[in-house]
């Protein structure tokens, strides 16, 4: 039976949330547009019956373990760190309490393409001063984490430690069933409970409200001399009729408990939700993988950053000691001079775009280093961000793309030229090959060198990601075909129109991106000068445009490709042509 002593008690709690410290300017901009909407909805929210929470599907996988139930606690404990085992000397530990959205799978290693954000949380904390320990486990609710896993974590707590509690996706479930027995009562009332026989544990059991369990965590964290942080849940891949990410009702409940208990609250649901709302639908979708709740590495990284930003930019005085242990929260950006107010043309590519580029004009040269010879630098700033050995995948994974993306402003241009390093062994230690296709396809591979798992996408997919990101920032992407190689089958220079050329065309057809065919413009130039009956003689004559091998160019070859870019821009009457000399 459900017992309530103060039926109307919950109606008035949200006024307390007005005193929860708001985030600094960045977070204020994201949150305030939702704030008054939440106040208006609050009265009705509390009096709704059962909410539609996440009753997660049962995923498959090689592990043969059901990720959304605690049916393999023994196996999970072999992969989760023993509570407190990551502590270094007398340093504090930041414990993460959550479910599969924080730690996916019993191993949490991404072998199913899904990642929990807790895996990436340590990126934002100084490991010399604090350990980040992910104690989350798939399938846990606020209640059964507290009953099954929390006691061991509680014993490991020491004064000065920190605990983030962000849990609730699995709370709308049966109370006493044989398989899970993990449900909790909606809301925050302390005096609401239900009793029954727990078939999973074979004992009489009592179930309390969501708010009750949060208070239990807070009380016991304080008893240990540690610091509690309540955090709302990461958003789902679910949208309202305006196409915006649906916000979770637990946000209001956690905010109330935090306010009344006097602990910091970080609205992860809103911070990440606002970011996702600013993306294209295509981009929103690839932040999730396999279902509507679990995230890809993209989504997990986004949520880890949002959690870090929520802590770092909070004005809550209790968080100041933790803020002093944080790193990498500010966006990584390209150091480009904006003082003139001129637009910037960013160039992204590989060693054919940026190479040794020696002052004496010897050795290998990339054409991007000569872009200033074709652009009028009194009108536009040239920023060559290409780097040797990069493919689309590696340029992204190395963080090079993130710096360009974070630096973009409306009116900028981005030249994208990849291909030479993109096709090869997908799992070797170079970690740069992509699926040879332009389709939106991906697959999980295990990398041979270190055994890690990575969800690898197609050549076309990575290009489409770059294109979409550039447009999101109000800048203009321009796709460039790869430079030609010094190969002369049948006495004419090699054309790669049936592989890369086809993939470029498919990306163009799908995205409508602007395109300059440097490959064929430069190839036409070389054919006109050197084509003949003897392939070897053709190659020898053309060698003056190349250096070291058949791919990399000399200073003269780099000049040729830079001129091909300018020619292509003029032929297409592209707006960027207005910035040429």
Predicted segments with their positions:
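Alpha-helical cap/lid subdomain in secreted, periplasmic
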Residues: 152-297, 301, 308-323, 403-552, ...
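Short, solvent-exposed loop/turn segments at secondary-structure boundaries
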Residues: 106-110, 241-245, 357-361, 395-396, ...
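Bacterial Sec-dependent N-terminal signal peptides
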Residues: 1-7, 12-52
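Acidic two-metal-ion nuclease catalytic site recognized across multiple nuclease folds
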Residues: 323-335, 580-581
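Short active-site-proximal "capping" loops at secondary-structure junctions
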Residues: 102, 137-142, 170, 353, ...
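Short, basic, glycine/proline-bearing loop/turn elements
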Residues: 134-139, 201-203, 350, 382-390, ...
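Serine-esterase "nucleophile elbow" of acetyl-processing enzymes
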Residues: 52-136, 151-163, 179-188, 332-386, ...
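N-terminal post-signal-peptidase region of extra-cytosolic proteins
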Residues: 141-152, 391-403
């Amino acid at each position: 039976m459900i017992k309530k002593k103060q039926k109307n008690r919950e109606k008035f709690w949200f006024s307390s949330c007005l005193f929860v410290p708001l985030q600094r300017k960045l977070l204020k901009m994201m949150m305030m547009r939702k704030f008054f909407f939440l106040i208006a909805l609050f009265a009705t929210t509390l009096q709704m019956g059962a909410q539609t929470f996440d009753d997660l599907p049962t995923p498959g996988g090689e592990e043969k373990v059901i990720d959304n139930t605690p049916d393999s606690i023994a196996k999970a404990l072999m992969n989760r760190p023993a509570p407190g085992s990551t502590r270094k000397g007398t340093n504090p530990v930041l414990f993460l309490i959550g479910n599969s959205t924080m730690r996916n799978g019993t191993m949490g290693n991404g072998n199913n393409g899904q990642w929990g954000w807790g895996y990436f949380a340590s990126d934002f904390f100084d490991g010399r001063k604090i350990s980040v320990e992910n104690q989350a486990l798939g399938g846990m609710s606020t209640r059964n984490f507290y009953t099954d896993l929390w006691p061991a974590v509680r014993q490991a707590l020491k004064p000065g430690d920190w605990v983030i509690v962000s849990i609730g996706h699995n709370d709308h479930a049966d109370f006493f069933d044989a398989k899970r027995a993990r449900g909790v009562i909606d809301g925050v009332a302390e005096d609401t409970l239900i009793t029954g026989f727990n078939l999973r544990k074979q004992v009489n059991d009592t179930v309390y409200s969501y708010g009750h369990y949060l208070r239990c965590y807070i009380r016991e964290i304080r008893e240990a001399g540690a610091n509690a942080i309540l955090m709302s849940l990461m958003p789902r891949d679910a949208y309202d009729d305006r196409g915006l990410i649906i916000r979770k009702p637990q946000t209001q409940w956690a905010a109330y408990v935090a306010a009344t208990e006097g602990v910091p609250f970080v609205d992860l649901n809103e911070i990440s939700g606002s970011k996702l709302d600013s993306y294209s639908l295509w981009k929103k979708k690839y932040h999730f993988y396999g279902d509507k709740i679990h995230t890809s590495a993209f989504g997990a990284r986004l949520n880890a950053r949002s959690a870090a930003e929520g802590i770092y930019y909070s004005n809550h005085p209790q968080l100041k000691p933790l803020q002093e242990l944080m790193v990498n929260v500010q966006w990584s950006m390209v150091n480009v001079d904006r003082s003139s107010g001129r637009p910037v043309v960013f160039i992204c590519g590989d060693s054919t775009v940026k190479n040794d580029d020696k002052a004496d004009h010897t050795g290998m040269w990339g054409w991007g280093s000569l872009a200033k010879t074709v652009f009028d630098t009194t009108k536009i700033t040239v920023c060559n961000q290409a780097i040797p050995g990069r493919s689309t995948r590696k340029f992204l994974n190395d963080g090079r793309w993130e710096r360009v993306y974070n630096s973009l402003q409306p009116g900028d241009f981005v030249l994208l030229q990849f291909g030479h390093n993109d096709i090869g062994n997908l799992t070797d230690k170079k970690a740069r090959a992509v699926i040879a296709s332009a389709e939106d396809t991906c697959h999980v591979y295990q990398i041979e060198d270190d055994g890690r798992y990575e969800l690898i996408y197609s050549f076309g997919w990575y290009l489409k990601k770059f294109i979409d990101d550039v447009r999101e920032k109000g800048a203009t992407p321009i796709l460039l075909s790869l430079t030609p190689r010094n190969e002369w089958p049948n006495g004419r220079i090699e054309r790669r129109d049936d592989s890369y050329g086809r993939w470029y065309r498919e990306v163009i057809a799908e995205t409508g991106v602007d395109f300059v065919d440097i490959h064929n413009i430069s190839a036409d130039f070389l054919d006109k000068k050197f084509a003949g009956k003897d392939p070897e003689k053709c190659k020898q004559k053309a060698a003056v445009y190349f250096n070291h091998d058949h791919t990399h160019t000399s200073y003269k070859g780099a000049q040729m490709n830079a001129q091909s870019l300018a020619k292509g821009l003029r032929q297409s009457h592209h707006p960027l042509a207005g910035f040429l000399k």
